Amino acid sequence: FNPKAAEVAMEDYKPGDKLVPYRVVGECMGTDLVDSEYEQLIPWVNPGEGAFRVIQGDYVTTEDGTGIVHIAPTFGADDAFVAKKAGVPGLTMTTAKGETRPMVDMTGKFFVLEDLDADFVKANVNIEAYKEFAGRFVKNAYDPTLTDQDETLDVAICMMLKQQNLVFRIEKHVHNYPHC
């Protein structure tokens, strides 16, 4: 937040203004937030009980990040370790063959609904919300029909969140993230 915006009256704000007014209504330590529950931002798949709550971890530093981060236990070793320790389930799908898999298949795209177990889909997938992104590659480089000029999945997701008024600000943040 821009400190100058703290002086802007809430009623003076108009959409598109550079300064977005805010007020600090309280302060707390990060440990005060542990076990707080929150609402799933993109409710495509229900991963199970206890998935959306604040947990404690010690591998994010002020040099590496903000100190509060989203974790993806299905895709990172550190995330998997801290999630398992706290009893947070990974976000996985059950395939039509009965296999438990991450949301992204072995080719680098979100599973298409037809490749998933019908009972799993019925019980756990918000078909309306997910179907627009089912079958999309997470990186354009994985899809031989796409180029660098085509819209990327991350941009499409950001635009969806913006259209649903679920995001405060979208910006690129370069950071280290091990992946294969």
What are these regions (language model features)?
Residues 1-180:
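Non-cofactor substrate-recognition interfaces
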